[in-house]
Design a protein with these regions (language model features):
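Alpha-helix initiation and capping sites
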Residues: 12-14, 25-29, 47, 51
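Catalytic "initiation/cleavage/transfer" segments centered on a nucleophilic residue
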Residues: 40-42, 47-173
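Short N-terminal edge-element motif at the start of the domain
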Residues: 1-15, 22-24
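Histidine-centered divalent-metal-coordination microenvironment in nucleic-acid enzymes
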Residues: 17-41
Length: 173
């Protein structure tokens, strides 16, 4: 799957970054939480993109995998009504949208989700991680951004992203 992210073809075209957390729940078993960050000036229709990613996952797993698309109009309205909308198109000049998007991203890395930790680690010669991320690389273009000083948002360095998406501590029993 990570190779598909890197290739940036099809539903991954204009992908800027991603976060992928592997978990093991008591009712769902093994599952993953995936957050994809696209260039919003190039891609839109988040519901459609999420469905395309789910179809790609079903293809990879030969029909054994499934996905849940939280980017439906109804689901996003529920989040918006509670002031929690952090998925879909995020506008950098909207502080609440930015904060909510960061809250969504931080959900992937919460080490306190103790009941969903990986109980059985995949076998390999070296320890396997349960969180993966793709990092946006600077492209050299300068954009003029007119944000109010009170917006509390701005350009993040790679270190800022690393600090936010720091890999969770893996607890082994």
């Amino acid at each position: 799957m990570r190779n598909l992210f890197k290739d940036k073809n099809g539903c991954f075209k204009h992908l800027l970054g991603y976060g992928l957390a592997l978990e093991q729940g008591t009712t769902k078993g093994y599952h993953a939480h995936l957050m994809l960050i696209y260039n919003g000036s190039e891609r839109c229709q988040d519901w459609y993109l999420a469905n395309e990613v789910i179809q790609k996952w079903q293809e990879i797993t030969q029909g054994l995998g499934y996905g849940v698309n939280n980017n439906t109009h109804e689901k996003k309205k529920q989040y918006a009504d509670r002031g929690l909308l952090g998925i879909g198109m995020i506008h950098r000049n909207q502080p609440l949208e930015m904060q909510n998007a960061l809250n969504v991203a931080s959900y992937l890395t919460q080490p306190e989700k103790y009941l969903q930790r990986m109980l059985i680690k995949p076998k390999a010669n070296k320890p396997k991680r349960t969180f993966f991320k793709g990092v946006y690389r600077e492209h050299g273009r300068n954009y003029k951004i007119n944000l109010p000083k009170s917006a509390g948002v701005g350009v993040w360095s790679e270190q800022d992203v690393d600090d936010l998406l720091d890999e969770p501590m893996v607890i082994e029993l």
